[in-house]
Amino acid sequence: MREETEPSERTLGLTPTWSVATVLTIFVFVSLIVERSIHRLSNWLQKTKRKPLFAALEKMKEELMLLGFISLLLTATSSTIANICVSSSFHNDRFVPCTPSEINEELESTISTVKRTQLTRSLFLHTLRRRLSGIGEDTCSEGHEPFLSYEGMEQLHRFIFIMAVTHVTYSCLTMLLAIVKIHRWRIWEDEVHMDRNDCLTVVAREKIFRRQTTFVQYHTSAPLVKNRLLIWVICFFRQFGHSVVRSDYLTLRKGFIMNHHLTLTYDFHSYMIRSMEEEFQKIVGVSGPLWGFVVGFMLFNIKGSNLYFWLAIIPITLVLLVGAKLQHVIATLALENASITEYASGIKLRPRDELFWFKKPELLLSLIHFIQFQNAFELASFFWFWWQFGYNSCFLRNHLLVYLRLILGFSGQFLCSYSTLPLYALVTQMGTNYKAALLPQRVRETINGWGKATRRKRRHGLYGDDSTIRTETSTIASVDEYNDQVLDVSETSPVQDNELELQLIRGACGNSSSVETPILRPCASISSTTFSRLQTETTDSLSRSSSLPMRREC
């Protein structure tokens, strides 16, 4: 009887001011801590000149702002939407994940459990009574029902909150695990720079490309079809152990340096980290297609479909496919080099886009982005169902499938973060083009300024033959591909005038082992006349500037 005579909920007009002030203080305090933490992190990234990570953080802030805006809209319009009435014929049992009888049964079972355990009895009973009363509540005229109830709007609001927290957390953990894994390869890079007698280069040339002894030997004795099948099987299982070994790293490092005409002392490891940091901003945030995926999932998650279980298989399957493909790229390069007779001098590894699906290495990054989002969505859905509907609800009734979903989700996320993403950062350097991270920031800013100036001239009809931009420190030739973050260095194009190379500025003695900054040599896309003028202008620029590196005298 006491439960039936309990007063209804108090409004703010009937609530003591001290309780309102206490709750408001707590929310403001927590929000300020989060805001200042993000602000300090942004300042630290800017101070350490980690612009790619700063851009990724800005993208996360945009995602939180978008989700916060959605949350505000839901809060502001919940009463209005709940008062929109539609015919009851639209609310049939075909497009519902649970039936009213199941909801009633589950809530009554939960009430009896709470009564037996006496744990937070009043809170649970009050919430459950609201839900039970909401099931049969009719705020519309006879034959009509709310388009979406007020309780449903609140539950959707909580899902947005859980989704934001889960996705941001997964994004940070993904980057953290990937960086930890890549930093373990630093010792191999240091070994190369410590090898002053170049002995490691000789060993790498003669032995490093035969690291996969099993299928290299099989390659010379078995039919081609079996060969390919065996290679794929080995590549599939290699991603579960040491996905990258020392010989893998040194093989791909040497191929990258030879293909792009860099010196053997180039710091490939630092370049790879810079490249991964720039690509990390592409796998954070929620794009339009991913939001479409969420909407489609909400639409087709009907009773008996077990859609959550089948969707949990997608990310782990994609992780295994992407990992096997990346391992297959390494295996292909190793087999190509193993087929060369006794490693003839002058033969070099041929990194190229043809090694990847559809000749697009960046496609793998899009798949990794989807994998990360799907895993975050899977975990957020589980927490949401548990919080809003209970552990024994119709969403989580089959506990075996729930456990399988969680195991697959966590396993796929760990494998993607600690194995697949670092492997992607290494293997995608084997494409035809090198990435913009190879260029120093000063050169990239100059090229970007040239592109903006050229586009401005074209808009005003002032574009002429003189397509160079002069600064106080350098003269840079045309590079239109900068906007795509890739500079083309394909070997198939004929080099008739001058070849675009990246050389390291070394001391005149030639015995320096320090890693220097690459600079641009003359570009192959300009004519001989323009090149002569460019040389003259560069000489004048060198005489005017004192900020360019100078040769050291022995």
From Swiss-Prot:
One of its GO terms (molecular function) is calmodulin binding. It is a multi-pass membrane protein. Residues 1-13, 85-158, 303, 388-406 are extracellular. The chain crosses the membrane at residues 14-34, 64-84, 159-179, 282-302, 304-324, 367-387, 407-427. Residues 35-63, 180-281, 325-366, 428-554 are cytoplasmic. GO terms for cellular component: membrane. Belongs to the MLO family. May be involved in modulation of pathogen defense and leaf cell death. Activity seems to be regulated by Ca(2+)-dependent calmodulin binding and seems not to require heterotrimeric G proteins. This is MLO-like protein 14. It comes from Arabidopsis thaliana (Mouse-ear cress).
